[in-house]
A protein has these predicted regions:
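Alpha-helical transmembrane segments of multi-pass small-molecule/ion transporters
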Residues: 1-300
């Protein structure tokens, strides 16, 4: 699968700026829904909160490393898997949790915490496992990834819009209340348009090569969902909390991952394919779970 690294993904500097803006717009919309009470609620449900954070920040990156050791993909694919595992949760987890009859308050608290800590946790986990696996360590030395620069970019993309959204909520509460639904809808619409445009520019490349990567993405996503579910069961959490942690573990911000790939890895084909496949598959698996759980009320 080494030839995947040489794939050319048509993604111009202007496209990178557009993706930056869309992700910032999405995070601003997320912040309009963020309330400090959501974070306070985590302390009241501390056991489930700790299990959820452990699943996201420690279990998934570690099990991804084990998966890479077992299947031994090309260094580019492995780096893509490590990066996605390190990315914070996707912004649709709260909605999927609601449809799944999970604990929405827990979902909001976990996803908010994940976004607030992303600038620190993402570069740390990526550097740890990227350097721990020798084939990717060699590749990272060749590329010379700057962890501080990555952390700063993640903060700009996620932290700045979050801060602006929180300030907007604090000083312009009426505007926030009237606009937050539209911000969320428009951000999803902009992202959908961007994905369609990107696919139109790279359709043949993606169609010809997606089967080489899809099985790895499905396997990793299955491990993520299964790991979150198993951890919740192990700690005997309420069923609604288990559903929430499962979803929070399996839905990741692949858009952020794709942006970092083009910013720091010159759009390396194998890494980009992992991020693109994740962006599609985690929605399929997440909504499939939501449909299944929507038919079944959680045990009390």
């Amino acid at each position: 699968m080494q030839d995947l690294d040489n794939l050319h993904i048509n993604f111009s500097p202007s496209s990178l700026w557009v993706l930056n803006a869309i992700l910032g717009f999405i995070m601003f919309g997320v912040a309009l829904d963020l309330k400090w009470i959501d974070l306070v609620q985590l302390t009241k449900n501390w056991k489930s909160a700790l299990v959820g954070l452990f699943s996201q920040y420690i279990l998934l990156p570690f099990t991804t490393y084990l998966l890479v050791l077992i299947v031994q993909p090309s260094p580019g694919l492995a780096l893509g898997m490590f990066l996605i595992a390190a990315c914070p949760v996707g912004n649709v987890t709260n909605l999927i949790t609601k449809v799944s009859k999970g604990n929405v308050a827990l979902s909001i608290g976990l996803s908010s915490t994940a976004h607030l800590l992303a600038a620190f946790v993402l570069p740390l986990n990526f550097a740890l496992y990227g350097n721990l696996y020798s084939p990717t360590a060699s590749l990272m030395r060749q590329i010379n990834v700057d962890g501080k620069e990555m952390a700063w970019l993640v903060f700009l993309i996620i932290g700045t819009p979050l801060l602006l959204g929180i300030l907007c909520q604090r000083y312009f509460p009426r505007f926030t209340e009237l606009s937050k639904v539209w911000f969320n809808r428009l951000s999803m619409l902009f992202l959908a348009f961007f994905i369609v445009a990107a696919f139109a520019s790279n359709g043949k490349v993606l169609v010809d090569n997606v089967q080489k990567v899809a099985w790895l993405v499905i396997l990793q996503n299955g491990w993520a969902l299964g790991g979150g579910w198993a951890l919740g069961k192990l700690f005997k959490l309420p069923e609604a909390d288990i559903r929430t942690i499962t979803i929070e573990s399996g839905i990741h911000n692949s858009g952020l991952g794709l942006l970092l790939i083009f910013q720091f890895f010159d759009g390396r084909g194998s890494m980009a394919l992992v991020a693109v496949c994740w962006g599609v598959w985690h929605l399929i698996s997440g909504w499939a779970l939501a449909w299944y759980w929507a038919q079944r009320s959680p045990a009390v």
